[in-house]
Design a protein with these regions (language model features):
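Pyridoxal 5′-phosphate
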Residues: 1-405
Length: 405
């Protein structure tokens, strides 16, 4: 049974107050709070085993290296990759995507070649490609969507040409909560001989992701959105692709042999991990993944689905409420909305005065906002520790604020 009281006890920050009100944290799409086990694990390593990894023969370096590589194995198991050689540590989803963009363009694309993305992408899966448009002449093609926030797969299929080299698409919209049919999209792309990058930042924290079942070629996600520390993320890549792609950055650790005439590189994943990694953060990430695994990803999904459905039901009863996406209540634990003529920034600011933390703005998805014909929304995003009582407080707060306008 999912014991929400016990779960919340693992997160000390949830017991604090804001403006004299109990904190209600509904901004999990931006970052999640950290369980005490993650904080303890990172502190323990700093206190007792703080040494650089892969570089020393001394005991502490060996211990730190073992923890770092054990974290890689934990990630491998969590997403069901075939080998730890397919797990690259990065600073987060943004760097993971930039790594793929830079290395894939350099190694596999030329001027006039095409990449397909969707209307609902985060800026981190748009701007890097636009930089390559300017630098290398890469062509960016966009999958359209319906007014309800669902991708048009028949239009997606029409975008493929002989110049299409890559598809890069979000698993879950960070604005709409739409869960895209990425497995089907991958199948279609592979029929055209095209590999696929999946932005899993908003999927991996909420439900089980199996890269072998998806058959994706790359998957990116961040530690801080799955109850781990900031500054660490993951790029999964099929071994054949990581072997083929050139390095993203140069420096220590990623080399095999350096001379002034020539440098040879390590095999993946080290080839893509130049410099000292954040080995404390990788240990924290592994601890976070062990924590959510202990709760059960299916249990987390069921809990968050219950919250999301309950919130949708309650929010829809508010006069002037406009919810974006969530056709048939089939979305992830993210709800974006506006209320009447209240500016989203005003609504978010006033909710904050009630101790309720939500996100406001364009959510790093301005092209999606343009498609919706709006400047921004209020976004409530749920995590494994949120409750129905917190949803009730959100709804009551919105109703109270609406009476002021």
């Amino acid at each position: 049974m999912y014991d929400i009281t016990k779960v919340r006890e693992s997160f000390p920050i949830l017991s604090r107050t804001v403006y004299g009100k109990p904190l209600i944290y509904l901004d999990n799409g931006a970052t999640t709070q950290k369980p005490i086990c993650v904080l303890d694990a990172m502190q323990e390593e700093y206190l007792n085993v703080n040494a650089n990894v892969h570089r020393g023969v001394h005991w502490m370096s060996q211990q730190a290296t073992d923890l770092h590589e054990a974290a890689r194995e934990t990630v491998r198991k969590f997403i069901n990759a075939r080998s730890t050689t397919e797990i690259v540590f990065t600073r987060g989803t943004t760097e993971s995507l930039n790594l793929v963009v830079s290395s894939f363009v350099e190694g596999c694309m030329k001027e006039g070649d095409e990449v397909i993305v969707s209307t609902m992408e985060h800026h981190s899966n748009i701007v890097p490609w636009q930089l390559q448009e300017q630098r290398k002449g890469i062509v960016l093609k966009v999958i359209p969507m319906t007014d309800e926030g669902e991708l048009l797969l028949e239009e997606y299929e029409k975008l493929f040409t002989e110049r299409t080299k890559l598809v890069s698409v979000t698993q879950v919209s960070n604005v709409l909560g739409t869960i895209n049919p990425v497995k089907e999209m991958i199948r279609i792309a592979h029929e055209h001989g095209v590999p696929v990058v999946v932005d899993g930042a908003q999927g991996v924290p909420h439900f089980a992701v199996d890269v072998q079942d998806l058959d994706c070629d790359f998957l990116a996600f961040s530690g801080h959105k799955v109850y781990g520390p900031t500054g660490v993320g993951v790029l999964y890549g099929k071994e054949k692709w990581l072997d083929r792609l050139p390095p993203y950055q140069g420096g220590g650790e990623m080399i095999e042999r350096v001379s002034f005439e020539k440098t040879t590189f390590e095999r993946p994943p080290l080839k893509f991990e130049a410099g000292t990694p954040d080995y404390i953060a990788t240990h924290g990430l592994a601890t976070a993944l062990d924590y959510v695994t202990s709760l059960g990803m299916d249990n987390i999904l069921a809990h968050e689905q219950d919250l999301t459905h309950y919130a949708l039901q309650q929010l829809r009863e508010i006069e002037g409420m406009h919810i974006y996406g969530h056709r048939n209540d089939s979305g992830d634990a993210v709800i974006s909305f506006n209320v009447g003529d209240i500016h989203h920034m005003d609504l978010g600011t006033l909710l904050d005065q009630l101790g309720i933390a939500v996100r406001t703005g364009h959510h790093c998805a301005q092209p999606l906002m343009d498609r919706l014909g709006i400047l921004g929304t209020v976004r409530a995003s749920f995590g494994l520790y949120n409750t129905r009582e917190e949803v009730d407080a959100l709804v009551a707060g919105i109703k109270r604020i609406a009476m002021m306008f």
